[in-house]
Curated annotation (Swiss-Prot):
Family recorded in the similarity comment: Belongs to the helicase family. UvrD subfamily.
EC number(s) stated in the UniProt entry for this protein: 5.6.2.4
Keywords noted in UniProt: ATP-binding, DNA damage, DNA repair, DNA replication, DNA-binding, Helicase, Hydrolase, Isomerase, Nucleotide-binding, SOS response
Gene3D superfamilies linked to this entry: 1.10.10.160, P-loop containing nucleotide triphosphate hydrolases, PCRA, domain 4
Name of encoding gene: uvrD
Protein name: DNA helicase II
Domain UvrD-like helicase C-terminal: 287-564
UniProt GO molecular function: 3'-5' DNA helicase activity; ATP binding; ATP hydrolysis activity; DNA binding
Species: Salmonella typhimurium (strain LT2 / SGSC1412 / ATCC 700720)
Amino acid sequence: MDVSYLLDSLNDKQREAVAAPRSNMLVLAGAGSGKTRVLVHRIAWLLSVENNSPYSIMAVTFTNKAAAEMRHRIGQLMGTSQGGMWVGTFHGLAHRLLRAHHMDANLPQDFQILDSEDQMRLLKRLIKAMNLDEKQWPPRQAMWYINSQKDEGLRPHHIQSYGNPVEQTWQKVYQAYQEACDRAGLVDFAELLLRAHELWLNKPHILQHYRERFTNILVDEFQDTNNIQYAWVRLLAGDTGKVMIVGDDDQSIYGWRGAQVENIQRFLNDFPGAQTIRLEQNYRSTSNILSAANALIENNNGRLGKKLWTDGVDGEPISLYCAFNELDEARFVVNRIKTWQDNGGALAQCAILYRSNAQSRVLEEALLQASMPYRIYGGMRFFERQEIKDALSYLRLIANRNDDAAFERVVNTPTRGIGDRTLDVVRQTSRDRQLTLWQVCRELLQEKALAGRAASALQRFMELIDALAQETADMPLHVQTDRVIKDSGLRTMYEQEKGEKGQTRIENLEELVTATRQFSYNDEDEDLMPLQAFLSHAALEAGEGQADTWQDAVQLMTLHSAKGLEFPQVFIVGMEEGMFPSQMSLDEGGRLEEERRLAYVGVTRAMQKLTLTYAETRRLYGKEVYHRPSRFIGELPEECVEEVRLRATVSRPVSHQRMGTPLAENDTGYKLGQRVRHAKFGEGTIVNLEGSGEHSRLQVAFQGQGIKWLVAAYAKLETV
């Protein structure tokens, strides 16, 4: 039988994995090493060479997109669709199983799946029905608690509270939630896996049926599995099934949502004699980029070990840029992208990666100023985010009480006991009397036309808005914004959200304060009050909208969102201690290695050119912060890195330190630290100098106006 079509396009290690005898196998697949190709060709090998039936194969992926691509590529390779295989995500396959055996799983035939929004709404109702204070027992935290317990395979009666009243209350919420779901025939995502696992445990004959059927199990991205997913695979395989897992311990970056990189080692322990094959040849990046990635990840302990290599070109060195601040950093990145575009490169080939969503705002503004289209991958633009729109709505209502859209958004955010029934009365009266919602509320309260509790809550809300408007009127814009975020209860509400999502929302609110501090008037805004001018600016930015999907646009995304993607030109910004690695990882033991794996993922996204940037000073989350360069920069081989400009000592062993100083004076006669006066912006201090002659530029920090770049020849600055 001619099997050359299955092997000819593969390298030696890929061939070894594809053509191995049927056995348990770990394929350690480095970034860009062709793991999807290996999985597809392995399935084709099992079908055509080993003569296994499609019905014997289950392939598990982590996204529906990956599953669809795998099915498509298998069909292309085999020349026909292979019916009978189960190819899908853990959740998709568990759902299929429960549909087939709904009675044995104690589910109605027409059971419905709850998405996270539905889950939140149900929990909100239950917490209220249990007479619990929603501020103390937030629905989002309840959802996190329940999903975490299910991911560990735990039902309410399994949980040991040890007399802890907080744990006991969450246990009761979980119990009430589960009973409500069972009554209504509802199943959330975590329940799909747990219920399917319990089905096999409670009905051995069903488990045996699937063990006899699925004798070949293949699992992709194994480093991202959690405990219940591992238990699911282990139970199905039994003693006779053959399991091939594909994963990369160096790319395990989802520990915060329950992923267990240790599952790879558990597999080796539970399947003694399993073969390990390392895919180390990289088809994506240049040799310089791979050398940097290898050196970086070698600083982690307990790795299973592999070293990426390529037979491609050495490529350009990694560029390292030290910016004065985040504005300079954004300007530098945009200028580099402009140069790439001018040389014939597409904008879509450029990706800007950052650790935190809050970092995108300054980058977005720089791209907008350069009229450069961009797209936020897997996320929303800064001014479109929920928490930002909440805060802006408070500011809008303070600026204009008759803003009905802003009123609707914040009247019960955070919850104040102003229910839909009360608001329906307000809306109807507004229509009848042809008045705004605010005006109607005033009249209804004066007429005592609303129920007591709701009336009191509405009265307090209106007093809050009036007080904020009066007390903050003369404050600087950033102080006013910070006060509104705190006094409105928004900050407290989002602080109660568990996990990374809540932390991200707080960071974004603090970044909004920074945005108001850095905001500077355009000429057309000069007749407006600062708050009105900023709100106009925010509305216009949000109104720009995402670049159309067909449009050539720069890609912006978090490092987590970048996993699995590749780009010719990659920028990783904010490479500073406390930013990346994040402060949380420095404060919590065991998190630093996951941050380093995240850096490794970022570096290995780059195909041709990688640029790393850090700032000496950064106004982030509402305050000026001075950070040291990230330790990850110091872990890169010196010969792989070329510094565009260096302003601080890089954090690396003393023998490798490279030091530099900023340009202190240029041929215009201006000096760093010199006090100057501008006709429009007032007094400020020169914080950066660049270029010479007619191209000389100055960066000046103006009091109350932010930091601005000026062309020295046209600035007409006076020395103070």
